[in-house]
Swiss-Prot record:
One of its GO terms (biological process) is fatty acid biosynthetic process. One of its GO terms (molecular function) is carboxyl- or carbamoyltransferase activity. Belongs to the AccA family. It comes from Syntrophomonas wolfei subsp. wolfei (strain DSM 2245B / Goettingen). Component of the acetyl coenzyme A carboxylase (ACC) complex. First, biotin carboxylase catalyzes the carboxylation of biotin on its carrier protein (BCCP) and then the CO(2) group is transferred by the carboxyltransferase to acetyl-CoA to form malonyl-CoA. Keywords: ATP-binding, Cytoplasm, Fatty acid biosynthesis, Fatty acid metabolism, Lipid biosynthesis, Lipid metabolism, Nucleotide-binding, Transferase. Its main location: cytoplasm. The gene is accA. Residues 32-293 form the CoA carboxyltransferase C-terminal domain. This is Acetyl-coenzyme A carboxylase carboxyl transferase subunit alpha.
Length: 318
């Protein structure tokens, strides 16, 4: 049976509740079990630390999909002193699974683009589970060109299972829309920093990942397709999804070793959702550092370095 949810924290919470009951019981019956309870709590924390430092790639996939994981909305609200969301692709409509606009980050006007997942059923339906349509990618391209025109740096936040694979999306040119974003980002004459904050799936994620710097949260994943899709296609066995997650090299550590990711932002113990302020502050400081480093570069130097960075990806080293 393939595990579909990372439920370790739930089990820890259940044990803590039992300990709390035991503590109350000992108080009522005048037994002093405080030392034993304290010792057990210390063991729980030590076990948690070991557990989270040794997560398998598949467990990181599950953690990256956690329904309470911070989304692009959360980070934008934390980062920006001012924020104006912009809508529409000026061709077909407005895709709510893509959030984009102008913000003031650390006193600097920036364009921020990201994918938007929901935290409950209503929001997931509204945002199409974070899967953009072609109009979403056209909105991204429009705002990228606007950022270049007004010389605003671009920050992208990536958390999507992939582009929406529906018939309507294909009829409206899904692949073409993604390719236009890739082409635009490759030649954009302003600094671009991309952050894989959760699930980075397929071409949908790749569309916002062409950047001067690529940052990744420690429990995020980034891959050409989901492990489930690869297991179904290559092995015809969904049960081998954990083997596929391992083989695909989709974790932040794997991708940094391969030279794709520039920096890993360590998440709080248990995941970004358990301590959002700490996670957001770490990411904010990393963005400030990288933005400060590349803002001083002229556009020609920036484009050349971006080109060389992209050319090295997938290069065979014998």
């Amino acid at each position: 049976m393939v595990k579909r949810q990372f439920d370790y924290e739930q089990k820890v919470q259940e044990i803590r509740e039992k300990l709390e009951e035991l503590n109350n019981l000992s108080s009522n019956m005048e037994f002093d079990l405080s030392q034993e309870i304290e010792s057990l709590e210390e063991k729980i924390e030590n076990n948690r630390e070991r557990r989270y430092k040794n997560l398998s790639p598949w467990e990181k996939v599950l953690l990256s999909r956690h329904p309470e994981r911070p989304n692009s909305n959360d980070y934008i609200r934390y980062f920006c002193e001012e924020w104006i969301e912009l809508h529409g692709d000026r061709h077909f409509g407005d895709d709510s699974s893509v959030i984009g606009g102008i913000g003031r980050f650390n006193g600097q006007a920036v364009t921020i683009l990201g994918y938007r997942k929901g935290k409950d059923t209503r929001e997931n339906l509204q945002y199409n589970f974070g899967m953009p349509h072609p109009e979403g990618y056209r909105k991204i391209q429009r705002l990228l060109l606007q950022a270049e025109k007004f010389q605003r740096p671009v920050i992208t936040l990536i958390d999507t299972p992939g582009a929406y694979p529906g018939i309507g999306a294909e009829e409206r040119g899904q692949a073409w829309a993604i390719s236009q974003v890739l082409m635009t980002l490759s030649a954009l004459e302003v600094p671009v920093i991309a952050v894989v904050s959760g699930e980075g799936g397929s071409g949908g994620a790749l569309a916002l990942a062409v950047a001067d710097r690529l940052l990744m949260l420690s429990n995020a994943v980034f891959s050409v397709a989901s492990p489930e899709a690869c297991a179904s296609i290559l092995w015809k066995e969904l049960e081998r999804v954990e083997d596929m997650a391992r083989a695909m090299k989709i974790t932040a550590n794997d991708l940094q070793r391969l030279g794709i990711v520039d920096e890993i932002i360590e998440e709080p113990l248990g995941g970004a959702h358990l301590n959002f302020p700490e996670m957001a502050e770490k990411l904010k400081k990393a963005l400030q550092k990288h933005l400060g480093e590349i803002l001083s570069q002229d556009s020609g130097e920036l484009l050349e370095e971006r080109f060389q960075k992209l050319r090295k990806i997938g290069e065979f080293r014998g």
